[in-house]
Amino acid sequence: MVSGCAIDEYSNIETGSVGEPLGVLGGSPSAEDVAQGRKFFGAGSYGLAEKHFRRAVEANPNSVSAWVGLAASYDQLKRYDLADKAYRRALSLHGRQPLLLNNYGYHYLLRGNKGAARKILREAERKAPDDPAIQHNLALLENWSYADNFDGVPEKPRKFDKR
């Protein structure tokens, strides 16, 4: 995936309690749910993806790939509050790695919070200055305007006339 939120980079990572990589997913109940979640996410079935990623984090709360997939699914479902919690959990497990920061910055871009998106994406850029996904998301941020807001998410809640 060139831009946006990438879940594939985390498909083979699980971590222990202090964040060290433990190896390739496989054979565990959470691994099957992560695989199914990735399949549904790729097909645009974000509700089903969320279901599988949620089951994966319940089975293995230390699975970075499950938390990232869950966060990305919540973003697509516009459940930004839950996505934020999932990203913070992934960050606590895996640290402030560039691709994870890229996803977290994109999350704030989707929310319409350009300030937070810029801060996090710039941190990702400092850690991986030549990463094309990070550069693409920074370009999206700089070229973003209220008029082309993704999926109509406003920066501030709109007040509707009650007539």
Predicted regions and their residues:
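Structural marker of alpha-solenoid helical repeat scaffolds
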Residues: L25, A59, S92-H94, R126-K127
